[in-house]
Amino acid sequence: MSIMSDIDVYKKSTGDYEALQERRPDYTGARNAFLKLASVYLKDKQSISVADFCCGTGNNTKLIADRYSVSKATLIDINEEFLQIAKNADINATHVETIYSDILKVDLKPEHDLVISMFAYHHVADGDKKKFIDVVKNALKNNGILLLGEIYSPDRSTTLAYYNHLLDHIPLDLKTPELQKFLQQTAESDDFEYKVSRVFAHKQLTQAGFKLLDEIKVWPIDQTFNRDVGTFVEVWKLIG
């Protein structure tokens, strides 16, 4: 993976990135689903070790650490500015470690109860996606949990239609030229966005020894696309 992208916002400040993402119903909906599923599958954990893949500014780990006892939080990203913000985010964990690395090259011990992967898998080229899953697997304890947020799309035309539909559902007062450019570049990206079908992802995870425990389809909730297209948050358990 490379931070160099054909999507301009990834080359700008983190504030620009976060502000644009907050206007997306799929993004904000995924965060709500993430917390809802965490409340079910982490509620009985006394103290957890968390690894956050492609963590960005650490928001998802912070959301977990504010609600559950976290013994260690390991945050991995290839963007140094994002990691610096994560370091200063006052994450409520006994120990916080940040790792500046390509996620495919990181070597983690199988000591984590939870791996967070929110919109990270589709930034990995298709030929490397199995390796990404292997890195997740190697980081987890047996029976560990993967919280996976993903946008599933089987082909480029569906991806373009998804982002057009998304833009149509953003209120006019939030639909700035910057947001429109961001979504258009994301839809058309061929060097930072590698979306795949839900069937493709589920096959890889199942073959790696994961079992799907739960899921929430976040967006869209209408019938524009078939059931397997859109933004999902899923709970996977490592069983083998």
Where on the chain are the PLM-derived regions?
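A conserved beta-strand element that flanks and buttresses the S-adenosyl-L-methionine
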Residues: I116
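Class I SAM-dependent methyltransferase SAM/SAH-binding core
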Residues: A51-F53, T57-K105
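Core SAM-dependent methyltransferase catalytic element
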Residues: G209-K211, K217, I221-G240
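Short catalytic micro-motifs in class I SAM-dependent methyltransferases
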Residues: F119-A120
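A short glycine-rich, Lys/Arg-flanked "PGG" loop and its adjoining helix->strand segment in the class I
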Residues: K130-N142
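Conserved class I S-adenosyl-L-methionine
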Residues: S2-D44, N59, L63
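C-terminal alpha-helical "lid/dimerization" subdomain adjacent to the S-adenosyl-L-methionine
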Residues: G149-A208, K217
